[in-house]
Amino acid sequence: HAYMNERGVGEAVKECGVPREEIWITSKLWPTEYGEGKTLEAIDKMLSRLQLDYIDLLYVHQPVGDFVGAWKDMEKAVEAGKVRALGISNFDASDEVFHTIMDNARIKPAVLQIECHPYAQRLEMREKVKPYGILVECWFPLGGAMSNGALLKDPTILEIAEAHGKSAAQIILRWHIQEGFSV
């Protein structure tokens, strides 16, 4: 919803010819949609825009506002079959907000989505959430918006890529996978 692409995604899913159960759909709740009661309504609207019966993974986009109330509604959506798994985005595992979710959740987050790439490795974060069984998924896996493509032009990465007959992007994505991150 935050990226205003749900209608297009829903149409693509319907038209692509691939069975729905073979497509993984992820979405995020915007902070203005947080709050017990309010979030369930937002999920229903999201599903309507997507023209789908369920979302595979739904994130709390940011740890602000009534994210605990949102989480309670997200759990209800899981129980109703509208959502399959829950995730948190932009939370820091050492912050109070992370522990607030963990202390209040009946259904624990399956995924923590954070910015990470070779310039922002976040390995400590991965280790902090590992005991909870939470997978770390990286946004900006090829480098942040402010990097202007620097990671893809990094001399060390280019040297490794050339030595292995791969592109810089392939080397970076391989690094993510070898480090145990989802991309």
What are these regions (language model features)?
Residues 7, 25, 40-41, 154-155:
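A generic alpha-helix surface/boundary motif
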Residues 26-28, 138-139:
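Generic beta-sheet signal
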Residues 14, 32-76:
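Glycine/small-residue-rich loop that forms an oxyanion/phosphate-binding "nest" at active or ligand-binding sites
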Residues 21-24, 55-57, 109-110:
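Residue-level recognition of the N-termini of beta-strands and the immediately preceding loop/turn
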Residues 62-183:
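Beta/alpha (TIM)-barrel catalytic core signal, keyed to glycine-rich beta->alpha loops juxtaposed to Asp/Glu
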Residues 1-23, 53, 76, 142-144:
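N-terminal binding-site loop/beta-alpha segment at the start of enzyme catalytic domains
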Residues 4-5, 31, 42, 91-93:
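Repeated polar recognition positions within modular binding domains
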